[in-house]
UniProtKB/Swiss-Prot annotation:
Its main location: membrane. This is Cell surface glycoprotein CD200 receptor 5. GO terms for biological process: regulation of neuroinflammatory response. Glycans are attached at N44, N192, N221. Disulfide bonds join C59-C129, C164-C213. Residues 39-145 form the Ig-like V-type domain. The chain crosses the membrane at residues 242-262. It is a single-pass type I membrane protein. The gene is Cd200r5. Residues 263-270 are cytoplasmic. May not be a receptor for the CD200/OX2 cell surface glycoprotein. One of its GO terms (cellular component) is cell surface. Pfam families: C2-set_2, V-set.
């Protein structure tokens, strides 16, 4: 896209409005990174939004009195592209998008922001707002990425081991342990783009009775406390107890046999 008749005053206006517009369209559920290397007439932005929350995407904040046409071009990962447009002079709205979750945040004559009311994995893709003005065309491109918090489970294994699993997260979660152990971590990718991470750890030290599993993810971190199954230590103790009981019983039997033997010997002598 090309800008026509660009002036220093217009350049300053665009810089200021990018900042204000970006702050209006950002909430605690989405993270924005701007690509400052893009031309002034087009800003490329990466937006990360947690699944199930609302996403709000902005155009250039140009006064509608200067706009002729505002068009949102939506290209989702696995669906055909569609458009939502607003003709300023006739106040006409046209759309080819079938997803009712994707709408104008307000009325386009008031604000051209696009809203996704409940983000799903199917909403990942590119969202481009093109604003046509007499001074030129201005665009803002969003690469929308959906974050999925993993479901975290854990359980103690056998012989001083523990297992921690972060299921179906996007992106993949990171798992660490305190204290450090001898760990094996595996990951499994799913067809919907989520990843399951599983970490199994073993601790040799007998003085380690409990450990913590720390799951780190873009949507938040979790720390889990796990008591270790003592395993072989418990078995050894049980064996020693059984051996001790057997030795005591053997001693009692020998004592009875010895007593009976000496009693019989005394009877024979008399």
């Amino acid at each position: 896209m090309h800008a026509l008749g660009r002036t220093p005053a217009l350049t300053l206006l665009i810089f200021i409005n990018i900042f204000v517009s970006g702050s209006r369209c950002t909430d605690k559920n989405q993270t924005i990174q701007n690509d400052s290397s893009s031309p002034l007439t087009q800003v490329n932005t990466t937006v990360s939004v947690q699944i199930g929350t609302k996403a709000l995407l902005c155009c250039f904040s140009i006064p509608l009195t200067k706009a002729v046409l505002i068009t949102w071009i939506i290209k989702l990962r696995d669906l055909p592209s569609c458009t939502i447009l607003y003709k300023v002079d006739t106040k006409t709205i046209e759309t080819s998008c079938l997803d009712r979750n994707i709408t104008w945040a307000s009325t386009p004559d008031h604000s051209p922001e696009l809203q996704i009311s409940a983000v799903t994995l199917q909403h990942e893709g590119t969202y481009t707002c093109e604003t046509v003005t007499p001074e030129g065309n201005f665009g803002r491109v969003y690469d929308l990425q959906v974050l999925v918090p993993p479901e975290v489970t854990y359980f103690p294994g056998k012989n001083r081991t523990a297992v921690c699993e972060a299921m179906a997260g996007k992106p993949a979660a990171q798992i660490s342990w305190t204290p450090d152990g001898d760990c094996v971590t595996t990951s499994e990718s799913h067809s919907n783009g989520t990843v399951t991470v599983r970490s199994t750890c073993h601790w040799e030290q007998n003085n380690v009775s409990a450990v913590s599993c720390i799951v780190s993810h873009s949507t938040g971190n979790k720390s889990l406390f796990i008591e270790l199954n003592q395993g072989s230590t418990t078995t050894t103790t049980s064996l020693l107890t059984i051996l001790y009981v057997k030795m005591v019983l053997l001693g009692i039997i020998l004592l009875h046999v010895g007593f009976a033997f000496f009693q019989k010997r005394n009877v024979i002598r008399t």
